[in-house]
């Protein structure tokens, strides 16, 4: 009798367990149900949250080789909602600095309503980005993408980080990086090409950034010049070039530095820019060959 009783009890336990699992699964939204909710939702922030839930489920079921595609689709889709959010918050963004500065330019505490708004956006993975000339916009923060990036191959994670670190480095034509930070960023691009020589498609995407960074490093920007009014090279930049040559002797950028250090004067900016462009066009560096293959 006991064996039969035990079997009955075991059967009830298993049945109860399956019922609990089915109930739990019913409570967990699937991709189709989330997409149906998304179609009806008009609030950009709530749409971002729904798309994150869809991405969570998609990444769980995707094979490793497919996750990069899932992630790229996700990043494109969420940017649509960020664009709409910036339109919706146009008034707030246009008066962003007025909430923080008085008429004499002194810092003041924003109103509590502004603080609450900004706290809400921060919690939703958004941040304020300064674009220059008093213009700001809402953008997705690194934290928004962090958990997805951690599920991607190392080569893609580094590609993504390089791209992000190169964004908006000179608002108002004023370099926000130090010369050394810019030099090290260029070196990271060159190291990436050596570490992942098979990533030709990503080289194409990185090529324009690499050329721009190299151009700024060698010729400056309108508001961060490489030389003074008399054409003398900025001493800080000269020291940085010398450091870069020593740290990265085999770099294409080092070849440019060696040539530029032989110049007596740095007033002819057009000639310097043309020389950088000429070297970039004739170089066989993988990041530059990728550009010429387009």
Where are the language model's segments positioned?
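Acidic, polar-rich low-complexity tracts and alpha-helical solenoid repeat scaffolds
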Residues: 25-294
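Bacterial Sec-dependent N-terminal signal peptides
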Residues: 1-33
